């Protein structure tokens, strides 16, 4: 606990809040071009082949972003929309690619949580 005199001399340091997705630069989404599409393995104790893409954003940042859902049609030079949001078991992946916008199609035959995966409403029979 500082004395009054110490506070007069030094003052309190204000804690600066660090962004969790700095490449977005306070935008909700950013457009980018895929430079590499590949799979990577998660941290212990999980095991899988997670689909990720390296994306060069319009503001010049190059980020690794996650491709959610089952199956995708991305390849190099695909134009995608990137949003914030990390993947807990993939170190360095702090962004998600938005399904169903620009070059990335929505998940096929998706019935539940469709809006998160850009899937159209199935035809009622």
Swiss-Prot record:
Residues 105-125 are annotated as: Disordered. Residues 113-125 have a biased composition (Basic residues). This is Small ribosomal subunit protein uS12. One of its GO terms (cellular component) is small ribosomal subunit. The keyword Ribonucleoprotein applies. The keyword Ribosomal protein applies. Gene3D superfamilies: Nucleic acid-binding proteins (2.40.50.140). The gene is rpsL. InterPro entries: NA-bd_OB-fold, Ribosomal_uS12, Ribosomal_uS12_bac. One of its GO terms (molecular function) is rRNA binding. The modification 3-methylthioaspartic acid is found at residue 89. NCBIfam families: rpsL_bact (TIGR00981). GO terms for biological process: translation. Belongs to the universal ribosomal protein uS12 family.
């Amino acid at each position: 606990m500082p004395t009054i005199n110490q506070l007069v001399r030094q003052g309190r340091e204000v804690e600066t809040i660090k962004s969790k997705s700095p490449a977005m630069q306070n935008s909700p989404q950013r457009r980018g071009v895929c430079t590499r599409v590949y799979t990577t393995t998660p941290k212990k104790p999980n095991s899988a082949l997670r689909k990720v893409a390296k994306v060069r954003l319009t503001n010049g940042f190059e980020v690794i972003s996650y491709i959610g859902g089952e199956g995708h049609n991305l390849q190099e030079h695909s134009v995608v929309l990137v949003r914030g949001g990390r993947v807990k078991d993939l170190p360095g992946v702090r962004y998600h690619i938005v399904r169903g916008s620009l070059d990335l199609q929505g998940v096929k035959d998706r019935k539940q949580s469709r809006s998160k995966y850009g899937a159209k409403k199935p035809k009622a029979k």
